[in-house]
Amino acid sequence: MDGFIVIDKPIGLTSHDVVARVRQTLRQKKAGHTGTLDPFATGVLPVAVGEGTKAIPYLDESTKVYRATLILGAATDTQDHTGQVVHAGDWRHLEPQSVRDVVSSFTGKLSQLPPMFSALKRDGVPLYKLARTGREVERERREIEVFSLVVDSIDLPLVTFTLSCSRGTYVRTLAHDMGERLGCGAHLTELRRLSSGPFNLDRAISLERLKELAEAGNLADVLVSPSDALGHLHALPLTAQGAERVRRGMPPCREDVEHGAGTGIPAGTRLRLLRDGIVVAVADSLAGLWSSDTKNLRLLRVFN
C-alpha cells in the first residue's frame, strides 16, 4: 500500500500517536505524517504510508486552512486552553465591532515569535521540553503570511474565525497576539485544520473508520496516490523502457519520454515522472532540456 491516508485527528492524540495507530492498523512499517498538529487540535492530518513517505519532501503544503475559536480575558503559557493563565484582563468594555476590526487586521505578511510550547528545537532539544522545566530561551521571529481571515462569529468573550495561512504559522500565537492588541489577553479554545495543501476534510476519515475499511479490505477509495498528492508538479509520461531505466537510477533519454512530452519545459521545473499514471520519480529539469541524451534531468527521488 503506497500513498496517503487523510486522518481526521481527534482531540487528545499527538500526531505521533496517530501515525502509530495507522501503522498498526495497516500493518505498515513505513509511515509518517506531513506536519504536526497540536494534541488539542482536530482535523486534517495526512499520513504517508509505504512509498508515499518518499513524496513528503515534495508536497506543496504551503497553504493551510484552519477554523479557530479564541476566548478573550486570559493569556496562557501554551497560548491555548491546556496551559496555565499568565495574564488576565477585562474584556467587558470591548464592542463586538472593535474586536472584529482587530481580529480581521491580522492578514498579510506578519512577524511571529514562535511559542515556547512548540516542537522547534534549541541545541537539539524541543522547546516544549525546556518550557516544561520553566525555562524560556530566545527565539528568532519568523515571517508568516495570512492570505485571508474571516470572522465567522462573535459571542464575547468567544471569537470564531477561519483563516488561510502559510506553512509554519502558529494560530495559537495569532490568538495570543490578538489578545495583546485588544489589551485583555486571549488564548485558543478550539482549533480545527480544514485543509493542508492538496489534502482536505472531504477525504478525511476517523481512525475508527480506517480500522473498519482495513478489516473489510476496502481502502482504495480513501487512499490518495503519490501522483495525486504531487499533482502540482509538471507530469512527464515515460515509456515502459524509460520507466525501467529511471527505476535503475538513470535519467531518461529523449526516446524514453512519450510523444515528445519533454519539449519546451523550462529549466528548473520540478517534475513527476509517470508510467501509466504511477509516479516513477521526482526530478528537476536542467538547462537546455534534451540538449543531450542523458543529462537533461536530475533525479531527486526514485519510487519502487
Swiss-Prot record:
EC number annotated for this UniProt entry: 5.4.99.25
Q: Could you tell me one molecular function GO term of this UniProt entry?
A: RNA binding
SUPFAM superfamilies reported in the protein's UniProt record = Pseudouridine synthase (SSF55120)
Top EC class per UniProt?
A: isomerase
Q: Which Gene3D superfamilies match?
A: Pseudouridine synthase
InterPro entries per the record?
PsdUridine_synth_cat_dom_sf, PsdUridine_synth_N, tRNA_psdUridine_synth_TruB, TruB_C
Q: Where is the active site?
A: D38
> Which protein are we looking at?
tRNA pseudouridine synthase B
Gene Ontology BP, a term: tRNA pseudouridine synthesis
Q: What does this protein do?
A: Responsible for synthesis of pseudouridine from uracil-55 in the psi GC loop of transfer RNAs.
> Superkingdom of the source?
Bacteria
Q: Which UniProt keywords apply?
A: Isomerase, tRNA processing
Write out the similarity annotation: Belongs to the pseudouridine synthase TruB family. Type 1 subfamily.
Q: Which reaction does it catalyse?
A: uridine(55) in tRNA = pseudouridine(55) in tRNA
